Amino acid sequence: DKNKIVAGAIVIVYDHHKRELNSNLMHVQHDYHELILSTQHVHVAHDLCLETIAVKGKAQSLQSLAHKIIGTKGIKHGKLVITDIE
């Protein structure tokens, strides 16, 4: 059910040296702030960052958010994992 409330995480890996990527990610996250519970940023290599974004909301909304984030130019890998909380 697309309107079911779920929780999960969006995990992305990206090169933090990519021009304008951090700014673009920040704008998307601010646009969807009501769905984002927290963000963890880890430097996993000299050029690579891993970001875990904890999310909660309607399944369809989380899929839309994940699609925008993972589709941002410069994202190397990304995945949305959700679980039922009802």
Give the location of each predicted region.
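Long, contiguous binding/interaction regions
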Residues: D1-E86
